[in-house]
């Protein structure tokens, strides 16, 4: 992981001094004004974090001087592991270190560790290392099956990356043998004793999909039930707007304002409007639910929203950031009722230039609850819908024209439009998956996307130019090493990518345009995505690479994203002219870190639960054959994707007809004798062997003797940057969209699937 900035200026100075070993007396001479206690505390913190070590001669130095490194321990399901070393902000990520069997030092998956690096390398050229100290444990709770052997009880963790845990019979709670349980670790074990734990929750009968889903939620810290004090506060809030307590507001209730969301949406946190101004420009209004009016700082609601960070969506379900009384009730911009909002009113011309923006707390009354499907049909000329919604047809058409202009300007400035298909899982009334299809983005989806982008950028620009604290959404430039890999895959298609110039996004736009028009190149957007950094939240405005935006934050989804709620509070404080304090800056920093972590947990949760639903759906097709495409390559086999987005593994031992070896540099599996290559994008005919709705694992085998359908060019794989400004993948799942459905196509080529 990346190092956080030194907590104090003193720590920064110490890291500079300790490039060479120093005694404490030497350090004091270098820093005479530091103070004895301050110096001791700073040194202790650096040693505890693994950045500084003390040798037997009581000399301090940065860990690298002693051939050591701090990092994150990454266990595997086998005896060996890896460590991802820490690295300074702005530098390229170093290669993972190989931890051979019996060199773990008692570390568990996800722990922060200090390792001694050897000059010896494993058979794949990775440096080996030995764990010499566990700096910090990743977490104290795991899930697994409760089993009994004789009179003893154990929990076998769901993930084989963790060891078995012994549980005393008095620590079983209400759990029965065979249940899936959550267990907290009371002792991590050593050479004499195995790990010990206490059962904290019974998640249901092991071996069921319901228990598997509960385990995924628990492992990611996602809990459906709100604390009583939070529910009490939410239920005490009136479900009708009280203008007497709403404060001074801009009254927009007579304006043509409406929402556009998915068919199944229940919470509406954004509405839009558009008016023609006397100068020929437009007043674009983006009106966001004023959650900050109801969720006040340091309240039980606020503390719980901070802890959750985001709503979590999976097929047929939502685990909300806020109780439904707020998210689906008084905060939701439901039609034909008064609602409090925070409005961004932006002056733009017909070519998409923004001339200014003002922001105000407002009261609105949405005139219609529109859906993407309806608006798309209206824009396509549906006579019935155009008659039913005649009062907004002209506005919708003007909005669409403006959205096209905004999109054009965004692309002209260098924004990357990856447009990677994303699978949508449909469930019936019983929660059973009945369809998997790719979501399509119509005109109205793109319209809302452009309008939300404008609001997010306008608020960020306002705050950043005034150097006021808030939480920004940032996206750093890509790692040149990753771009070099992408360039090597794009070269056979005639593209010349210069990895040393990541700021020149025009070169990537050329690739993306080509991929839209050539099926053979459709894998390239996914490979480019893998080369990009992951977007995150920060208390500094450093811009957004993928959007090519100098100023950017999240303002438009405070019902389901905590950083948006913080952005509202900070903006209102700025508008009122209130003084910002050091506490505000600290709060923004903490909110940014927490929001980034919770977004990652939500993405992990959604991805893993999606796998369970997809596996459940695919069980009906076991034994059947499909056309597929290689979507990833690892030493243990190749991943393949069907045309509906279902992805599974062909294990290396099932690839017959040759002895296949893993070519890590080119992400390929290569036949030693025939030279046959399996790499990203290689089409194959596959047979479905198994699908588990308790692990999400799907297994395929080659249906035609392990030979590719045709020989194709080498290419790489995966990770996240922002796609839609309204939220991450989970937010978009909330909405419906058109796409292909039914059984995975036989004889059809699959589109590339985005993986997070």
What are these model-predicted stretches?
Residues 203, 701-709:
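Short beta-strand-to-coil "C-cap" segments at the C-terminal boundary of structured domains/repeats
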Residues 91-99, 162-167, 646-662, 710-712:
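A short macromolecule-binding patch
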Residues 73-75, 146, 630-632, 642, ...:
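Non-cytosolic beta-sheet module surface loops
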Residues 1-285, 292-338, 376-377, 668-674, ...:
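Charge-lined substrate channels and their catalytic hotspots, especially those that engage the 3′ end
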Residues 124, 144, 192, 689-703:
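Internal insertion modules embedded within essential enzymes
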Residues 29, 177, 182, 187-189, ...:
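Electropositive polyanion-binding surfaces
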